[in-house]
């Protein structure tokens, strides 16, 4: 019995390199298919829009970008790069949907915002203004939960 198992083991070893080559060929085939996708410079299919927001609430700019290779997305506030923080949240998914969410908007956030998409073929930008409405009295409009009421109706 041990002699038979030895033969089976030696008999199966020549097939392993063939299988390994087959897998490598499949990987190469998949890479070739991916490379056939046409290269396109970035362009926006949905651009960000001007927005009026009450101080203390949240603001969100949404856009959608296409392009191949997948563009790198950067956000700017008055031409200065926006760094992600508790105040600025940046999202970008595989579908090309981009968003910049500004929590607890204050007077300093009243500015021009730009989304810039860049790949090896070029770049595209879209720009919008955020107008912050400040309340007359201190403390008004600070209530939580007011932020999302209008956005829910999409």
From Swiss-Prot:
Q: Where are the transmembrane segments?
A: none
The biased composition feature labelled Polar residues covers 10-19
A biological process term (GO) from this entry:
tonic smooth muscle contraction
Keywords, A to Z, come to: Calmodulin-binding, Immunoglobulin domain
Query: What range does the record give for the signal peptide?
Result: none
Q: Which Gene3D superfamilies match?
A: Immunoglobulins
Q: Which CDD domains match?
A: IgI_telokin-like
Region (Disordered) location? 1-24, 134-154
Q: Which GO terms describe its molecular function?
A: calmodulin binding; myosin light chain kinase activity
Q: Which Pfam families match?
A: I-set
Domain Ig-like C2-type span(s) in chain numbering: 42-133
Family annotation (InterPro entries): Ig-like_dom (IPR007110), Ig-like_dom_sf (IPR036179), Ig-like_fold (IPR013783), Ig_I-set (IPR013098), Ig_sub (IPR003599), Ig_sub2 (IPR003598)
Q: SUPFAM superfamilies, from UniProt? A: Immunoglobulin
What interactions and quaternary structure are annotated? Binds calmodulin.
- Give the UniProt family note: Belongs to the protein kinase superfamily. CAMK Ser/Thr protein kinase family.
Recorded protein name is Telokin
